């Protein structure tokens, strides 16, 4: 566990200011993210996005000085539970923000929400918590997993692709991924493979793809998994033979390592760095200046999580004491999202637009995804109808 002293010195200085007599205590935010191993780049983006938002808001959220406590969940659900309990019981955090991976979300969901603490996920958005297991203490600033994954399925169907090969990790988000794709694609699934979470060698899977000769592949392999798969896919000579469709396999967190190997590959997303909103332009420029890298969805969604908290606390005058009032304030989504339009559905998941994006190389040599076309407008996930909240 470490407190947020780097890389943003400005936040640290602001967060350590002693409050004046009679002022509210510091707002404590616990961030839970994967910050070690091959997927660490995803957690770093999540952490960085939230920190940048706090800096841009003058070191305060809803008028209160902020203390951010960051925990590395190590992509281990049991470790995540131990650390989140420490955030709640020892550190007395007001909010928990995270995690990256859905298996970690499944583990920490009950300990956080049962404690009456608001859990805001800036990435993981599983189908079960969008439906029957929805919870008033759980808010999502990303998406319900199926939605982002459905973009590629819709594109494959509309493009007239006949045969697709599917690959994803064997955990909840992986299963949601393939379900989301198949909900829109009605052609032939020539094969469907679930690999162990964290797998880095794909020689066996690439051999099967070459033998199957599909029109396209659909891949959900985030972080280091995607970095290795894309490089090996290109090296195997398959990139010129079939369409590469994906979700969170080629994005700004992985492109610095994938580089030209990912050029021209497609993904489904709710955002891209070139999304034309004034807020987004400022965010992308600020993130690149602060961290020397192009922000990914993990960063933008956690930036929005900070804006969500700030907007809610402005409505409650900085107070988190009345949980009903706090939840109602969060539900109003009193902020301007980097993606533009944003509102919560009854299950506290966003209703938003989704895009097909394509990997491009910028004039300055950096890589990013760029919007190819809008696929869904004001899209609400299909599981909300099963959520008892209204």
Where are these regions (language model features)?
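Bacterial N-terminal signal peptides that target proteins for export
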Residues: 1-9
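Extracellular/periplasmic Venus flytrap/periplasmic-binding protein
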Residues: 82, 127-130, 135-236, 271-282
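Solvent-exposed, acidic/polar segments of extracytosolic/periplasmic ligand-binding ectodomains
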Residues: 27, 331-390
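Periplasmic-binding protein-like
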Residues: 31, 87, 91-100, 120-122, ...
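Extracellular/periplasmic periplasmic-binding protein-like sensory domains
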Residues: 230-303, 314-320, 363, 369-389
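Sec/Tat signal peptide C-region and signal peptidase I cleavage site
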Residues: 16-23
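Beta-alpha junction/loop-to-helix N-cap segments that form part of ligand/metal-binding clefts
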Residues: 26, 41-46, 56, 60-129, ...
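Extracytoplasmic "Venus flytrap"
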Residues: 30-51, 71-78, 100-101, 167-175, ...
